[in-house]
Amino acid sequence: MTVADRAPLDVAIIGGGIIGIMTALGLLHRGFRVTVYERAASWPEIGAAFAFTGVARQCMERLDPRVLESLARVAQRSPHEKVRYWDGFHPRTKEAAQEESAVLFEILEKHMAYWACIRGHFLLDMAAQLPDGVVQFGKRLVDYNDDEANEKVVLCFADGSTAESDVVIACDGIHSATRKVLLGVDHPAANASYSRKSMYRAMVPMADAVSALGTEKAHVQIAHLGPDAHVVSFPVNNGQVYNVFLFLHDPNEWDHGHTMTVPSSRSEVMDAIQGWGPHIKEIVSCFPETVSKYAIFDQADNPLPYYASGRVCLAGDAAHASSPFHGAGACMGVEDALVLAELLGLVDAGPVAARQRNIKAALQTYSSVRIERSQWLVQSSRDMGDLYEWRYPPTGEDGAKCKAEFERRSKVIWDFDVDGMVAGAKKKYEHSMEA
């Protein structure tokens, strides 16, 4: 057999985000040829904040130690042993809102063991580990052809160019173009849908936060819960500024298409929290007059029936876009990346003549292994958003019930056997080869 006969698998990754670049590193680490096709013209400047659990970090190290090393360079470990969840609605004075009786429940941070980072910082650090030429910018996928008669999958881009690869991993996010091709544009799950939650963010001077909440609350991460809304807040910039995220339930449809950010106003936010305690109203009064309203989309209403078809698969948000209320959506994508890398490693080591069949078997195995856990996360995150806003009937406003439900669901995320997941996936793939 010639060297050419044993050429490594050629993998195309659609999307140069966190999961796409992480997957690329994991595959390169295993000797694959990898090309990442990113629709943007360059890397993003900053981006949102992400947090990764201990389970996700275990997956990163197994995927490629360089991934975890990148995270360690840019991440901040949670400095808080616990997060307190306060009543944002019933206290009628700022003083009452600071009393112990206003604490609904508190959660220890040791199990989730979050490391938080800015998306752009992590992405750029990982990207610096990639060889030159791996990433091609300005490549927006519009179609692909996975005809069995063709030796490779043909990718078609908006600029008129094409490319070929043995296997395609789509990490192109919540509005995945690949998902639309894989499922069909008319499939209910082809597009993510509005979760009926929106979010507003503001940076408040620390002095104003102390005035509204008190010194103790303003210097730690906390959450305030209440009817149809909740507020998550924490200090940043070495305690000089207070970062506030206010989430609202929205009974209406989102009438801005797939535009997820629209202009809004402080008065609109204030109208939504009428009846809340004076401490929350005071914090909102510190928002700038013009704010952005962020729509939260997910796949909870229309979960995908499968994540793979032929030699093409979806990973991360392209497969299971989640709301942020578990803080674990990106962690699911890390688990996806590890399973894919391990299964494709088996394909690459197998007979070249059977590669096309084996790629399909590996991707079907990946889909079957990952779909239950990742889709549980999507639905559970929806439920957690309702729990925080007293819209989840089993818990209502009861702090003890909220805590028990929070801990039960969180345990599914952090108490997870990564080695068992990988071993189970490999065993399932090997059984499919025997069929």
Swiss-Prot record:
Keywords: FAD, Flavoprotein, Glycoprotein, Membrane, Monooxygenase, Oxidoreductase, Transmembrane, Transmembrane helix. FAD binds at residues 38, 51, 119, 317, 330. The keyword Cell inner membrane does not apply. Induction: Expression is induced by the azasperpyranone cluster A-specific transcription factor ATEG_07666 which is itself regulated by the azasperpyranone transcriptional regulator ATEG_07667. Disruption phenotype: Abolishes the production of azasperpyranone A. Azasperpyranones display potential anti-cancer activities. Azasperpyranones A, C, D, and F exhibit potent growth-inhibitory activity against the A549, HepG2, HCT-116, and HL-60 cell lines, with IC(50) values of 2.39-14.42 mm, respectively. Moreover, azasperpyranone D significantly inhibits HCT-116 xenograft tumor growth in BALB/c-nu mice. In addition, azasperpyranones A and C can bind with four kinds of therapeutic targets for cancer, eEF2K, FGFR, survivin, and TNF-a. GO terms for cellular component: membrane. It is found in: Membrane. FAD-dependent monooxygenase; part of the cluster B that mediates the biosynthesis of azasperpyranones, members of the azaphilone family that exhibit anti-cancer activities. Azasperpyranones are synthesized by 2 clusters, A and B. Cluster A is responsible for the production of the polyhydric phenol moiety while the azaphilonoid scaffold is produced by the cluster B. The non-reducing polyketide synthase ATEG_03629 produces 5-methyl orsellinic acid, which is then reduced to 5-methyl orsellinic aldehyde by the NRPS-like protein ATEG_03630. Belongs to the paxM FAD-dependent monooxygenase family. Glycans are attached at residue 191. It comes from Aspergillus terreus (strain NIH 2624 / FGSC A1156). This is FAD-dependent monooxygenase ATEG_07662. GO terms for biological process: secondary metabolite biosynthetic process. GO terms for molecular function: FAD binding; monooxygenase activity. Its EC number is 1.-.-.-. InterPro entries: FAD-bd (IPR002938), FAD/NAD-bd_sf (IPR036188), FAD_monoxygenase (IPR051104). Its cofactor is FAD. It is a single-pass membrane protein. The active site is at 201. It is an enzyme of class 1 (oxidoreductase). Pathway: Secondary metabolite biosynthesis.
